[in-house]
Regions:
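OB-fold single-stranded nucleic acid-binding module
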Residues: 20-197
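Bacterial Sec-dependent N-terminal signal peptides
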Residues: 1-23
């Protein structure tokens, strides 16, 4: 009947075109197409990837078509669930819309031992940590470590930030960044020098 057809069309439409929370999207299977709404917590400083966060979780979206998305933009992004070296992400992204200026989430203050799967891709902050290395960050992309005196965590310095080549701060610092993953290791990905203070 017409009513059943209309109901089926509405169900199909809602399944494909209405976004879900990012926490719900993270539970979808690899290969599933999803649409998420959230705030971009980074812009071009990390290259083609954009980290999108809402009140429930965060998810990176990867694609050269995202270059106009800037930090703080409220966006809707559609893409395919994919896992790259342990990091759950939307790749490829098939479409996006910039909805306007969003409200940047406050970095969640956590101990470095809490940088794990539960907070993957979210904006976090560590206080009273120190870099294990001294001297200067390598030119280009590199990985260094921070310590709280007992535990260590990898910090991935992306070569497209203004961090590479700069002096590594000595002594206790605070650092903000995105929780990433590469294979079995979780890592912190700062966006620029202002994330290290």
């Amino acid at each position: 009947t017409m009513k059943k057809t209309l109901t089926l069309l509405l169900l199909t439409f809602s399944q494909f075109y209405f976004s879900q929370t990012i926490a719900e999207a993270r539970n979808q299977s690899i290969g599933q197409t999803v649409t998420i709404n959230g705030v971009a917590t980074n812009g071009g400083e990390l290259g083609a990837i954009r980290y999108i966060q809402d009140a429930t979780a965060a998810l990176p979206a990867y694609g050269n078509n995202l270059s106009s998305i800037q930090r703080g933009d409220s966006v809707s992004v559609t893409g395919v669930m994919f896992e790259f070296s342990g990091l759950l992400e939307l790749s490829p992204t098939t479409s996006y819309t910039i909805l306007g200026q969003g409200t940047m989430p406050e970095p969640l203050l956590i101990p470095i031992t809490s940088a794990n799967e539960d907070l993957e891709a979210q904006l976090v902050r560590f206080d009273n940590v120190s870099f294990v290395q001294s001297g200067f960050f390598s030119s280009g992309s590199s990985t260094v470590q921070i310590t709280d005196g007992t535990n260590t965590l990898d910090v991935r310095v992306n070569g497209s930030t203004n961090i590479d080549g700069s002096e590594i701060p000595s002594g206790p610092i605070s650092i903000v960044g995105l929780v990433g993953q590469f294979n079995a290791n979780h890592q912190l990905i700062p966006r620029d020098l202002e994330d290290i203070f």
